[in-house]
Amino acid sequence: MTKFTILLISLLFCIAHTCSASKWQHQQDSCRKQLQGVNLTPCEKHIMEKIQGRGDDDDDDDDDNHILRTMRGRINYIRRNEGKDEDEEEEGHMQKCCTEMSELRSPKCQCKALQKIMENQSEELEEKQKKKMEKELINLATMCRFGPMIQCDLSSDD
């Protein structure tokens, strides 16, 4: 009787393990399929615009900044008008990104999408920009009202 009980418990354990592994594999496959159906380009554009700015960093000392210092009023007027278009475009990228990412049904899958963006874009960035990108990706997750991203590791280990 004891051998039968042990055998039965072992059999139940194996069935439970197989079902669990099958469910996990199904979730992985489902997320992979969802990611293939989502266009991450608007997200990548939005993030790159955020981390690279629009040329108005104070530490840049190029000709445009020199012109800005010598003709401040006129250039500011032009830049304000340009900024509106760029802001609208940036807002458009963010909105398109949120729409695309809303197709991903779970926080884990959304995290994988953010990790993919990080992986795709971070190769050409300096360490400081990579850190800023991590921060902007988390901000994007908040703005798009994704699920909890607490356990989402975006750090790039290059």
From Swiss-Prot:
Keyword rRNA-binding: no
Protein name in UniProt: 2S seed storage albumin protein
Subunit structure: The protein consists of two chains linked by 2 disulfide bonds.
Signal peptide from the UniProt entry: 1-21
Stored InterPro entries: Bifun_inhib/LTP/seed_sf, Bifunc_inhib/LTP/seed_store, Napin/2SS/CON
GO molecular function (one): nutrient reservoir activity
Propeptide: 65-81
Keywords assigned by UniProt, alphabetized: Disulfide bond, Seed storage protein, Signal, Storage protein
Organ and tissue specificity: Expressed in cotyledons. Maximal expression in parenchyma cells undergoing DNA endoreduplication and cell expansion but not in actively dividing cells of the cotyledon.
Gene3D superfamilies: Plant lipid-transfer and hydrophobic proteins (1.10.110.10)
Organism: Glycine max (Soybean)
Entry similarity comment: Belongs to the 2S seed storage albumins family.
